[in-house]
């Protein structure tokens, strides 16, 4: 997988119709920044933040939602606190109120201290991020959630390659399911073709494109986008 260069946001950022903007978001923000971000959240977002048991998780949720508002507000030309969200039946956030007609579509994923956000116009889009954490039952999880040929490929690999391949499969499937709004129950219906040296392709949905990402050491990610012919841009918040 290619390493991409994540650039600082330019002063006058524009999103063209054939672009997908990918944002790398550090969630461990200084306390002063966290307070500013919290001030932009809605009452239901603040209530969600307060339901986290661990303060670290509360802070990271606040940072992720506040920065998402900042990013989307920049494209919409409004203050972060003015951005309105609706939620699909499975809880996927989408733009609501007058912003629903903007054509701006986005998706957010986070793992530990990092989040990724994908934004574009008109194309359905999903993104997933996973840290390569030790998982003792990789093969049993793969047998449950992956197709037989995916499971067999994983089993055939040396032990040191299995973890990364497992999470590459997982992020590609999850990114597509997040884009379509389907739940994790359909993981085993999504076929991904990949090898340790070849990029992933969505066999189940040939009209969709996949891009794998390495946003940080020891993690993998993927973005699924409806259609082809789009250009990725990589920004660091």
UniProtKB/Swiss-Prot annotation:
Gene3D superfamilies: 4'-phosphopantetheinyl transferase domain. GO terms for molecular function: holo-[acyl-carrier-protein] synthase activity; magnesium ion binding. Mg(2+) binds at residues 128, 130, 174. Pfam families: AASDHPPT_N, ACPS. Its EC number is 2.7.8.-. Its cofactor is Mg(2+). InterPro entries: 4-PPantetheinyl_Trfase_dom (IPR008278), 4-PPantetheinyl_Trfase_dom_sf (IPR037143), AASDHPPT_N (IPR055066), P-Pant_Transferase_HetI-like (IPR053581), P-Pant_transferase_sf (IPR050559). The keyword Metal-binding applies. Keywords: Magnesium, Metal-binding, Transferase. It is an enzyme of class 2 (transferase). SUPFAM superfamilies: 4'-phosphopantetheinyl transferase. It catalyses: apo-[peptidyl-carrier protein] + CoA = holo-[peptidyl-carrier protein] + adenosine 3',5'-bisphosphate + H(+). One of its GO terms (cellular component) is cytosol. GO terms for biological process: lysine biosynthetic process via aminoadipic acid. Coiled coil: none annotated. Probably activates the acyl carrier protein (ACP) domain of HetM, by transferring the 4'-phosphopantetheinyl moiety of coenzyme A (CoA) to a serine residue. May be required for maintaining vegetative growth and probably acts via HetN to inhibit differentiation. Belongs to the P-Pant transferase superfamily. Gsp/Sfp/HetI/AcpT family. PANTHER family: L-AMINOADIPATE-SEMIALDEHYDE DEHYDROGENASE-PHOSPHOPANTETHEINYL TRANSFERASE, PHOSPHOPANTETHEINE TRANSFERASE. This is 4'-phosphopantetheinyl transferase HetI. It comes from Nostoc sp. (strain PCC 7120 / SAG 25.82 / UTEX 2576). The lineage of its organism: Bacteria, Bacillati, Cyanobacteriota, Cyanophyceae, Nostocales. The gene is hetI.
């Amino acid at each position: 997988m290619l390493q991409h260069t994540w650039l600082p946001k330019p002063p006058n950022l524009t999103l063209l119709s054939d672009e997908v903007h990918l944002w790398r978001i550090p969630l461990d923000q200084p306390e002063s920044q966290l307070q500013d971000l919290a001030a932009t959240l809605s009452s239901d977002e603040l209530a969600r933040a307060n339901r986290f048991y661990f303060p670290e998780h509360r802070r990271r949720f606040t940072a992720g939602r506040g920065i998402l508002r900042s990013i989307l507000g920049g494209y919409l030309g409004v203050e972060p606190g003015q951005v309105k969200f609706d939620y699909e039946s499975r809880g996927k956030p989408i733009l609501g109120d007058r912003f629903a007609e903007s054509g701006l579509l986005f998706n957010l994923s986070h793992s530990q201290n990092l989040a990724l956000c994908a934004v574009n116009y008109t194309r359905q889009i999903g993104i997933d991020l996973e840290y390569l954490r030790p998982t003792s039952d990789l093969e049993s999880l793969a047998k449950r959630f992956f197709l037989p040929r995916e499971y067999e490929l994983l089993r055939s690999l040396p032990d040191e390659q299995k973890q990364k391949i497992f999470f590459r499969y997982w992020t590609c499937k999850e990114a597509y399911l997040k884009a379509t709004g389907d739940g994790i129950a359909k993981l085993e219906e999504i076929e991904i073709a990949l090898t340790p040296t070849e990029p992933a392709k969505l066999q189940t949905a040939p009209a969709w494109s996949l891009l794998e990402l390495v946003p940080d050491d020891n993690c993998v990610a993927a973005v699924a986008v409806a259609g082809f012919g789009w250009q990725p841009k990589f920004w660091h918040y």
